[in-house]
């Protein structure tokens, strides 16, 4: 009696009582239990691409545990949606800049938490295995549902990581590097005509690695450009004067 009184005052409970207890519902259908299951399915199915049935859930104890976790995630997701909707009504002003920063921080945290809950729901939904659907369909439906709820997905990678997907970029890394290098070379290459040739006896070769490759006709044009020099050429004598 004294031990129970002290545990009640201190707020501690027996570790054995903290274990999860699930009611057996396969043997008979208790109306109160079935009502709770239907309420949980209604909360979870609102966020899933295809609805689950009670038969899918009560087929095994693991599915029942998944439903309990999914119900908690669904309620958390709905709470985040409500908070995001309320925070989006805030209009930033210069009167209270500290409030603007707090609202922005709460908005980002709510979006990230909602995305995480949605990703976990998709993972639990796929683990049930009662619906014939592919992982790509799940991701597409999840993104579409989030877009329809006017929620910007702050971290789409959470879905990919949770579902075990690897992003497939449209452009490979080495292709992107080659494209950037070609753009850099074309932007930094300077034509030979732009170099000052006042005191230069010969022009720079067009095959220099510092310059981009040019067509053959351009090389011919560049080679025919006269080179200026500081040496003044002597005037030629007329043939008549030389003959005289």
UniProtKB/Swiss-Prot annotation:
Subcellular location per the Swiss-Prot or TrEMBL entry: Virion tegument; Host cytoplasm; Host Golgi apparatus
Chain residues carrying a lipid of type S-palmitoyl cysteine: 10
Keywords from the named record: Host cytoplasm, Host Golgi apparatus, Lipoprotein, Palmitate, Phosphoprotein, Virion, Virion tegument
Superkingdom per UniProt: Viruses
GO terms under cellular component: host cell Golgi apparatus; viral tegument
InterPro entries tied to this protein: Herpes_UL51 (IPR007625)
Chief location category: virion
Keyword Phosphoprotein included in the entry's annotation: yes
PTM comment text: Phosphorylated. Palmitoylation is necessary for Golgi localization.
Family to which this protein belongs: Belongs to the herpesviridae UL51 family.
Function: Plays several roles during the time course of infection, including egress of virus particles from the perinuclear space and secondary envelopment of cytoplasmic capsids that bud into specific trans-Golgi network (TGN)-derived membranes.
UniProt subunit comment: Oligomerizes. Interacts with ORF55; this interaction mediates ORF55 incorporation to virions.
The protein's name in its UniProt record: Tegument protein UL51 homolog
Origin organism lineage: Viruses, Duplodnaviria, Heunggongvirae, Peploviricota, Herviviricetes
Gene behind this protein: 8
